[in-house]
Regions:
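Membrane-interfacial amphipathic/re-entrant helices at transmembrane-helix boundaries
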Residues: 1-22, 49, 60-72, 98-102, ...
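Inter-helical junctions in multi-pass inner-membrane proteins, predominant
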Residues: 1-17, 170-177, 201-242, 265-278
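Single transmembrane alpha-helix segments in multi-pass membrane proteins
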Residues: 4-55, 86-102, 244-250
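Helix-loop-helix "hairpin" substructures at the membrane interface of multi-pass membrane proteins
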Residues: 14, 145-227, 250-255
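Hydrophobic core segments of alpha-helical transmembrane domains in multi-pass membrane transport
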Residues: 47-52, 73-83, 108-118, 157-168, ...
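Transmembrane helix-bundle core of multi-pass membrane transporters
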Residues: 94-95, 103-173, 200, 266-271, ...
């Protein structure tokens, strides 16, 4: 019982990270109907920017954890947002009216470019970092097994829920959110009605990239190690989470992330850890067969 509870806590934490990344996927898809396959690598870039910022602040003598994290969050999210804007301008906007596969191929090219840029500039070796938020709460101790809830896990869960609440409010209550929903329903009609669709799409990429950077910072603080390849695996799993939860739905993205995180962690705990990725990706196949619109997704209505 205690062991299962610990895995539940670990799975929820990992799922929240996947959910943060998945929100970026689902926002972009909801507006332009395309998957940003460079999004996972922006998450990776955000993790490296966070590491660079934390090391730089430490070298300047700024070691107060709250201040260092706040400055790092602004730095990483700001630069990652710039990367997201660049991806939209370079890989998507020029090819928006082209055949459907053109932006996809272009985004994959941007993904490979980001991976190789980080590999060349930061090296291929794993980058470690010591824990900034140690300690936690011991929930129970049974059969010589202590169930621990770390402060970092609590921070990840709270951050994800706050982000979900803020962006749900953004999409439903603000002029930008109304523009996003109008573009999602009919991009050309939104443009005819006076909405700056190019600006709305660019801001969507910028917001999604900033969220990916937040997830990158959470990943760095939680696991303490990163490399240039983490964006690919995490990105594919977050995409799986977005599809499972219902792509286009913000709560669905987080719900899908939770399910993928729980499946991965429980599989690693009770079965062979070598097949945890197989188990996670198998869920995508099952979801596409039996629930093609996802758990909270809406069936598309084809206009005639």
């Amino acid at each position: 019982m205690a062991y299962a509870l610990q895995q539940l806590i670990n799975g929820v934490t990992l799922g929240m990270i996947y959910g943060l990344i998945a929100v970026g996927y689902t926002m972009v898809y909801g507006i332009i109907g395309m998957i940003n396959f460079a999004h996972g690598d922006i998450f990776m870039v955000g993790a490296f920017l966070s590491l660079i910022s934390l090391l730089g602040l430490a070298s300047l003598g700024i070691t107060a954890v709250p201040l260092a994290l706040a400055l790092t969050l602004v730095f990483a999210a700001g630069l990652a947002a710039l990367y997201g804007w660049t991806v939209e301008r370079v890989a998507y906007r020029p090819l928006r009216e082209s055949f459907r596969l053109a932006p996809l191929i272009s985004a994959i090219g941007m993904s490979i470019t980001l991976q190789n840029f980080v590999q060349v500039s930061q090296g291929a070796r794993v980058k470690p970092m010591e824990a900034l938020i140690p300690g936690g709460i011991q929930l129970m101790n049974r059969d010589d097994f202590a169930v621990q809830l770390s402060w970092m896990q609590i921070a990840i869960v709270i951050t994800t829920l706050l982000v979900l609440a803020v962006f749900t409010w953004l999409v439903t209550k603000t002029p930008l959110g109304r523009s996003m929903r109008a573009c999602e329903q009919d991009l050309k009609m939104a443009s005819l009605l006076g909405i700056d669709t190019d600006k709305t799409i660019s801001l969507t990429f910028v917001i999604g990239a900033a969220l990916a950077a937040v997830a990158g910072l959470m990943f760095l603080l939680y696991y303490g190690v990163i490399d240039f390849y983490i964006g690919f695996i995490a990105g594919v799993k977050a995409f799986t989470a977005a599809v499972l939860g219902g792509i286009g739905s913000l709560p669905g993205a987080v719900l899908g992330g939770l399910l993928i995180g729980l499946i991965e962690v429980f599989w690693s705990a009770y079965f062979s850890v070598e097949y945890k990725d197989v188990a996670a990706f198998s869920i995508l196949v099952v979801a596409l067969i039996f629930m093609p619109t996802g758990i909270l997704g809406r069936a598309e209505v084809e206009k005639v």
